């Protein structure tokens, strides 16, 4: 085949990446006039959100203490199955026939499978009037017990009718107070601007008079908190910019992830949200190019987190035996100056043994130089010394 398949694969991959990778960056999608120093604003917001994640336990405890019976009912769930079970009980008790879901494209509804669940319960969607309404709480504030919702005039009208209002929030969405909410709203507004210009922030304080119910969902977020370097990824805004510029995601798509998280943020979180042994490949698929860090609105150090994932996977021995054996042999070669300085013929043989047949089937092993860089450097030094 003389590398024709390989050349075709490379050219198609390059075309795919060029066509799919967005040229947008965070800097050219915002109004720079809103910020005196955009880079500093991103870092500050990142620090605030990551600090809230670090203090999640304190903020949740404070929120629980601040909540009064007059605010309505509040439920805690470790997984979405328990949440849906409680929701089914509520539907049966109240004899609910119609529902309304605000912002149906939200990743949260996809995560808990709300739409498919309501269809199974034989309830019908109603825009004009519904027995129960669902809203995503983008942030919950521990000092006041209020929520932040992105909505429009229709959302406000829905909140004030006589239906049962169900608010759903992940534990990672808790914030200490509203001191830095202005900066968060500016950057979040810019992120949602292209999707829907009519959305604007609403801070809502729940009340039992309005039949308000709050569902707080863990769903393995607390498991991520056990990993100190990776826990700050829970501050993610879910803007999708990192996926837009990721060469792996643009070439392979999101089918490999099979989750609401995809792209670089999935390479960090998925191994800890799911069974880590089944998702080791997502951390190793990353090329560590750094495009995601450049466009992240809150400057998350995604490359460092992915590297920490790989280190943890290696320490726990979660790689298949064949991969571990190859890594061990490669490590021996790369850490030995003598082996690296061997003539190219023997290096080529070793590479053939280390690389599987599937990789060598349609791809040529690059030709090795006769001398290593170290040998050439010493040789050049000797020549210069002799000339003197």
Locate each region found by the language model:
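Short, contiguous, pocket-lining structural segments
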Residues: 173, 234-238
